[in-house]
Amino acid sequence: MNNSINHKFHHISRAEYQELLAVSRGDAVADYIIDNVSILDLINGGEISGPIVIKGRYIAGVGAEYADAPALQRIDARGATAVPGFIDAHLHIESSMMTPVTFETATLPRGLTTVICDPHEIVNVMGEAGFAWFARCAEQARQNQYLQVSSCVPALEGCDVNGASFTLEQMLAWRDHPQVTGLAEMMDYPGVISGQNALLDKLDAFRHLTLDGHCPGLGGKELNAYITAGIENCHESYQLEEGRRKLQLGMSLMIREGSAARNLNALAPLINEFNSPQCMLCTDDRNPWEIAHEGHIDALIRRLIEQHNVPLHVAYRVASWSTARHFGLNHLGLLAPGKQADIVLLSDARKVTVQQVLVKGEPIDAQTLQAEESARLAQSAPPYGNTIARQPVSASDFALQFTPGKRYRVIDVIHNELITHSHSSVYSENGFDRDDVCFIAVLERYGQRLAPACGLLGGFGLNEGALAATVSHDSHNIVVIGRSAEEMALAVNQVIQDGGGLCVVRNGQVQSHLPLPIAGLMSTDTAQSLAEQIDALKAAARECGPLPDEPFIQMAFLSLPVIPALKLTSQGLFDVEKFAFTTLEVTE
């Protein structure tokens, strides 16, 4: 006879169940009872009064019938409102530039008890070793850190140079890991729609789990075909009717509000009582400065309530229960008997003011998390080592020749969006007919010795200086934008010297730089230190012109060939709408 009861993503022994049942019946002593608390009812609306009873990791009972129940410890909630722990439905922790350990320290006290992350940033640089490190971090975390197995490494075959592959055989080795919830975003949507066998093999292999999508702006028969293949959700929607159509066709909608891609205002009007079980919240990419100053999922909930008048129970529903159901995490997302005791106590539910957080039945202490961070990071055995196999460059590497009277393609940036427009500009002896055009280059950093791929960028707001980074989705080559070849070379050489990182150059000097020693993506500094360094970088960048709110995150997506319309990879200028390389000069 099997001596344990298994759920999809957690395991509880028969002995634990017997103890939990005894507390539920009132025959045994609870570990904790939370008194003076109201529970927000995410199913019916309104509130439930009465204590919350906890045994081990689980809730044993809820309601006034437990007012006199015995407990080893009682927590006085002082009239707080209790809600389930918040869940981020899709993110890349690497984009915070924090390690998973530091990320937990920064976000768990804000109520973020669960994350569904795709570590494809580090997998693109290091391959399976990067995924293995994330799994080690997830295993030791207090926060529920679940992993989607990265499906597109690189993002699009044959369009860029990256650091490693992640084969189906390697992916399958992680499929049954207890922290794995499914297959991460399938970015090659044209390949799926056309029925490429290699992609269908991946979908088939993970079909019993959750299949994440990625299809910005997709509609019509192509969207139908993509969903027919089994894709279940999308976090890339940026227009109201696009989101509505995906919901109508059975997709779940992840409403994203990151540091660069900000889609909440466009999509929040869709949320209602009927479709909220199919709506989730995610950040995708959010930097440590915003987390420290504005928050994480708590910030998104606050905006739904204050700016979009979403009812409390619906706002908290899409931040927890909806996501838990979607990913089969049936032990999460509700404050109910038998559920894991991931609880956020709010002194003000409308303002999402977090008073206390419990995860897996234990109160969280922010100072303890900070004190243990260094030791826990060391225990995870981070994959240190220089991943920048690139020699220093000179200004001549960025020299472009232009012919007066000719027209040249320009990548046009849309502030706070990941999509770009493809426009053009005419060159004359006095320069381009647009004064906002600057230069952009992408340099592969994995030892292939390719010449820099160079192009033109408009709308970014760079009036002087140069910015360079090794955070450049998804292959994470070196991306640099600038007004002069000399300053571009200086910025690139600084990030090479740092072993990866971010840099701002102005007036011929490095004004600010941030080394990222893990894969050229992440720092080992504390969240507070990292936020301060990001603040200094942003201040230096603002001196270069009216840039996007998050210039480095916006810049990081200019080389991603799966988001429209015109991008630059290490192999050249890529027309995303045609899924083909194109020329800098317009000849057609």
Curated annotation (Swiss-Prot):
One Gene Ontology term from the biological process aspect of the record: adenine catabolic process
GO molecular function, one term: adenine deaminase activity
Enzyme Commission (EC) number: 3.5.4.2
Keyword annotations: Hydrolase, Manganese
Cofactor: Mn(2+)
Class of the enzyme per the UniProt entry, highest EC level: hydrolase
Catalytic activity: adenine + H2O + H(+) = hypoxanthine + NH4(+)
PANTHER family found in the cross-reference section: ADENINE DEAMINASE (PTHR11113:SF2), N-ACETYLGLUCOSAMINE-6-PHOSPHATE DEACETYLASE (PTHR11113)
Family, as annotated: Belongs to the metallo-dependent hydrolases superfamily. Adenine deaminase family.
Subunit organization: Homodimer.
NCBIfam families, A to Z: ade (TIGR01178), PRK10027.1 (NF007457)
The protein's name in its UniProt record: Adenine deaminase
Lineage: Bacteria, Pseudomonadati, Pseudomonadota, Gammaproteobacteria, Enterobacterales
